[in-house]
Amino acid sequence: MSIFLQADSLSVAQNALAETVPVEKTISIWELLTSGGIAGQMIMIALFIMLFFAIYLYLERLMAIGAASKIDNNFMLQIKDHISNGRIDSAKMLCASTNSPVSRLIQKGISRIGNKLEDTNTAIENAGKLEVYKLEKNVSMLATISGAGPMTGFLGTVVGMVMAFHKMASGGGQIEVGALAEGIYTAMTTTVVGLIVGLIAYIGYNHLVVKTDKVVHQMELNAVEFLDLLNERK
């Protein structure tokens, strides 16, 4: 008889313990992203718009810069051969048929053959500045997003914190700690998303800068090589 009583007591104790153990509340990523109220949701929308533009700008510039860096290794050899043998028109046609910043620089220089070397150099430099401007088009927007993303996320966190403490004040200070903590970690979500957006834009920006510098270096080398060729013809 006592054995049954002990078993019943143990069962009651286990049930009571199960009732006192708090059930862990789970939340999906989507619920976390959209749980910041109207203000938080608007800031999240702004952050995702920034993320979309950052990815789009990066991919668009990456393809454009990649296309600009492609040039036939024999291009300058053919230019040297044409100019050395007086085939200026053939050199111009070769440049016109090659779509690259280097070919446009050389084409500008060929059009100045017969003028002073300083004038030719100036024309090539001006054409080079235009090509660099084309390469760097919209790249600065990535730098802007890399800074604006984290700041926008931080703004969302501040707004969320203000709303959480306003809710506590409106309740006369009688608010559960769990509810306050939920409001705080929801507000912190915008900072996390903002940092992710800023990091993606920052890495993309620096990668494009490195690739642009390589193309500019290639342009400078070919421009110097062309000017040396003109100097030898004198």
Which role fits each region the language model picked out?
Residues 2-20, 157-172:
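Juxtamembrane non-transmembrane "cap" segments at the membrane-aqueous interface
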Residues 5-75:
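Hydrophobic membrane-targeting segments
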Residues 184-204:
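Hydrophobic alpha-helical transmembrane segments of polytopic membrane proteins
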